[in-house]
Amino acid sequence: MVMVRDIFHEPVLVNEVVAFLVRKPGIYVDGTLGGGGHSSAMLRALFDAGFLAGSLLIGIDQDDAALRVAGETLKEFAASTVLVKGNFCDMGGLIASICAEKGLEPKVMGILLDLGVSSFQINTPDRGFSYLREGPLDMRMDSNASRSAADIVNGYDEQELARLFYRYGEEPRSRSIARAIVAYRQKHGAVTYTQELAAIIRGNAHGGEKVIKTLSRVFQALRIEVNAELDVLRQALYDGIDCLDETGRMAIISYHSLEDRIVKRVFAEKARSDWGPKGVGLREPLSWGSVAPVTRKPLIAAPDEIALNSRARSAKLRVIEKIHEGGRRASE
């Protein structure tokens, strides 16, 4: 079998994730299992600390290939793991179902989400995620999902495409690129391959590094739309926080500003107590914040890690902890 590190990316900020999440026995959830790199490190840390016997790791991924590889990676810890196909936005139901089967209370000690597309998906031409490789214009993280990138590129009108590229790609040339795609469709028919779309984009972008940035932004926008990534992320953050046990933690690794903005806002919202309208002068808030930040600012990878793993360059890690009602973090 090909080594996991050869087909899936090396786990980003893995030492920091383990240090923040693994502190006691309990249920741990890796909602973006991938090749199992982060999960393997967490399970090893649980074992080394003597916590493994009282712990369970639930790994969730939409990708059948990821689940197969992760199963091989984690076979040493098979008795302490449950791997399940699903979307992390459904983690609440998945956790409840698995815990019910095992007679466990569905209270989680640690949740990890490592967002974005995996290197394996990027490097597999048939998945259609990369503008560098010829393949069908697909971009579905779940290969059984109904809508592909080709459906969007060929089904949206010019205004819808422009809005998409600007909203999810923050692309300044969104209108001209959308116009060029529609013109191409009218002349040549449907756009069905990644290199076909890349050629259209290159013809409507400035030279040099700006072309690469434009390609990245447009492909990012399509991937987000195909997989409803930002809506899924919001749902997962709310559900995940609800699943946390008291003192349980959630760690999120994001890779672009749209993701990080959502994580920051949801964490801030859940940490905020509601004191009602100004001037009321309540002795206690109407409702207490349910989490507290563990990282006041997002953590980034050290230069040494970036040198070894370029994907770490844009990674940001934010961590929160479930707190007592009206209290501070139990660890403080």
Swiss-Prot record:
Keyword set, alphabetical order: Cytoplasm, Methyltransferase, rRNA processing, S-adenosyl-L-methionine, Transferase
Entry's Gene Ontology molecular function annotations: rRNA (cytosine-N4-)-methyltransferase activity
Enzyme class: transferase
EC number: 2.1.1.199
Keyword DNA damage in record: no
InterPro entries attached to this UniProt entry: RsmH, SAM-dep_MeTrfase_MraW_recog, SAM-dependent_MTases_sf
Keyword Ribonucleoprotein: no
PANTHER family: 12S RRNA N4-METHYLCYTIDINE METHYLTRANSFERASE, S-ADENOSYL-METHYLTRANSFERASE MRAW
Family statement drawn from the similarity comment of this UniProt entry: Belongs to the methyltransferase superfamily. RsmH family.
Protein name as catalogued: Ribosomal RNA small subunit methyltransferase H
Record organism: Pelodictyon phaeoclathratiforme (strain DSM 5477 / BU-1)
Gene name of the record: rsmH
